UniProtKB/Swiss-Prot annotation:
UniProt name for this protein: UPF0276 protein SO_2008
InterPro entries per UniProt: MbnB/TglH/ChrH, Xyl_isomerase-like_sf
NCBIfam families recorded: PRK05409.1
A Pfam short name: MbnB_TglH_ChrH
Protein source organism: Shewanella oneidensis (strain ATCC 700550 / JCM 31522 / CIP 106686 / LMG 19005 / NCIMB 14063 / MR-1)
Taxonomic lineage from the root: Bacteria, Pseudomonadati, Pseudomonadota, Gammaproteobacteria, Alteromonadales
Family the UniProt entry places it in: Belongs to the UPF0276 family.
UniProt-listed Gene3D superfamilies: Divalent-metal-dependent TIM barrel enzymes (3.20.20.150)
């Protein structure tokens, strides 16, 4: 019998006390933005250390700014490495975007979809990996405009993965959000992703501003079309580790576990279907 698929949850400070008592068995790993935890001390710091000593953690960064025209903040990367070494965390992902340029921009901005940007990002990926002594996994991001685009989002993303020879954190919700906002076929985009490059998945909720505009919020339950896209993702690319993101409007843990268990159910069905095809 095959082991079940892995499902994780983004850790928030509000969860620390409860999870230090007992982490629900449905949660296989936790993910944190290192920027929010690197300088944490006191009670929260002790609770966090307790959890990292007992459970599997991934890091998902916010401030690397891999696509910025400004030089990489190498001291920041070294602090990330020290944090990951301290807590024995192996997985580090970041957004394929930038958040600095003539100062910090306080948002994740899309990188121009150009050949020059592909090569620029690839060089910086290797710089980061050399310091971290770990792979850098890049995430497809939601975006609302594509300035100076010379290629499609799909062409840009796959070109970066190939040029940098790196893995992909595939955000299923971002595919759906972008497909509505930029009017493309979400399923076709999903199927075009290189299976061998996908490291793990993100799934989250979004806000419907209008029929033509969705906002990637991570502040609500997962929507039905995103569940359907996740189901298609497992069928197309296999059952991959999947993380539920919920950044605000945090419900009770029991409610989050309902979604986590639903992810497990989709994974189990996909595994069963694969086993039937093999048999």
């Amino acid at each position: 019998m095959q082991e079940r698929g892995l499902v994780g949850l983004g850790l928030r400070r509000e969860m620390l006390s409860e999870f230090c008592q007992q982490l629900p068995s449905a949660i296989d790993f936790l993910e944190v933005a290192p920027e929010n935890w690197m300088t944490l001390g006191g009670k929260y710091g002790k609770q966090f250390r307790q959890l990292t000593e007992q459970h599997t953690f991934f890091c998902h960064g916010l401030s690397l700014s891999i696509g910025s025209p400004e030089p990489l903040d190498l001291e920041f990367v070294r602090r990330i490495k020290a944090f990951m070494d301290l807590h024995q965390i192996d997985v580090y992902s970041e957004h394929l975007s930038y958040c600095s340029g003539a100062g910090h921009l306080y948002d994740l901005m899309p990188i121009p979809f150009t050949e020059a940007a592909v090569k620029h990002v690839a060089r910086r990926v290797k710089q980061v990996e050399d310091i971290l002594e770990r792979p850098l996994i890049l995430e497809n991001v939601s975006f609302y405009a594509a300035p100076s685009a010379q290629m499609t989002e799909l062409a840009f993303l796959t070109a970066v993965l190939e040029e940098a020879d790196c893995k992909l954190l595939l955000d299923v919700n971002n595919i759906y959000v972008n497909s509505i906002n930029h009017q493309y076929d979400a399923l076709a985009f999903l199927k075009a992703m290189p299976t061998e490059r996908i490291a793990y998945l993100h799934i989250a909720g979004h806000f419907k501003e209008s029929e033509e505009l969705l906002i990637d919020t991570h502040g609500s339950d997962i929507n039905a079309p995103v569940w359907a896209l996740l189901d298609s993702c497992y069928a197309e690319h296999g059952v991959l580790p999947t993380l539920l993101e919920r950044d605000f409007n945090l419900p009770a843990t029991a409610h989050l576990l309902d979604e986590i268990n639903q992810i497990h159910a989709y994974q189990a069905r996909a595994k069963s279907n694969l086993d039937k095809r093999i048999a």
